[in-house]
């Protein structure tokens, strides 16, 4: 395919943003082993970069994935790996399933403010005993009245110390015979009124060999209640 004028305009604006708003601060963020996710994501959201392929009804641009690829190529000009990885978690890991399958109510609560950059998100799949073996995860969400009650832990969570909510994979049918069919994605608030949500503990921020500017965490969940 050939890039259109619209593709080129997106590329130019994204490259300018990278050079003006990100690269001048990369060395500082790498040294501090964290970057100001809320501040940067809000700027990205104001430019429309967090919702390029997301539905227009929730504030996205409603464009096809070729535009997402152009944006990601521009973000590759960031002079570190941690920041573009963190942005990618927000745009391409924690929100796509929500945009496709989420109810209008839950999309308004989580997707819309993630597109505007008012919320920072993370993806919760890997666990201490289940890294690449996703079927072996132990975190479970048990129905109790109108809620799920979640217990377990998640490991190597990008954006983990700063995220406002998590797109979590959990076992929702503990007695199911097929461990590949007993799981659900659940939007789990990690903060309430600016404070850590009840039952959620950021156990530790992990030290890494690279990707230093991206905060990576281990997170515990102890009887965390989430509406079904």
Regions from the language model: what does each represent?
Residues 48, 71-76, 169-170, 188-195, ...:
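Short Ser/Thr-interspersed hydrophobic loop/turn segments at strand-loop and sheet-helix junctions
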Residues 117-125, 169:
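A short, Trp-centered hydrophobic/proline-enriched beta-strand micro-motif
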Residues 139-142:
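A structural signal for short hydrophobic beta-strand segments in well-ordered beta-sheet cores
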Residues 151-201:
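A short core secondary-structure module
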């Amino acid at each position: 395919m050939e890039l259109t004028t619209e593709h080129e305009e997106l590329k130019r604006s994204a490259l300018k943003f990278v050079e003006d708003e990100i690269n001048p601060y990369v060395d500082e963020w790498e040294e501090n082993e964290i970057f100001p996710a809320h501040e940067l994501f809000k700027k990205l959201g104001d430019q429309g970069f967090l919702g390029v392929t997301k539905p227009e009804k929730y504030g996205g641009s409603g464009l096809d994935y070729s535009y997402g690829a152009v944006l990601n190529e521009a973000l590759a000009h960031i002079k570190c790996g941690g920041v573009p990885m963190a942005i990618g978690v927000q745009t391409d890991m924690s929100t796509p399933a929500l945009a496709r399958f989420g109810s209008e109510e839950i999309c308004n609560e989580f997707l819309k403010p993630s597109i505007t950059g008012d919320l920072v998100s993370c993806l919760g799949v890997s666990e201490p005993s289940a890294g690449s073996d996703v079927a072996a995860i132990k975190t479970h969400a048990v129905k109790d009245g109108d809620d799920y009650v979640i217990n377990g832990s998640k490991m190597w969570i990008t954006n983990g110390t700063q995220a406002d909510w998590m797109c979590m994979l959990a076992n929702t049918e503990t007695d199911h015979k097929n461990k590949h069919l007993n799981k659900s994605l659940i939007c789990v608030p990690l903060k309430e009124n600016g404070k850590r949500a009840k039952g959620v503990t950021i156990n530790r921020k992990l030290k890494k060999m690279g990707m230093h500017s991206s905060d990576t965490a281990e997170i515990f969940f102890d009887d965390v209640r989430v509406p079904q």
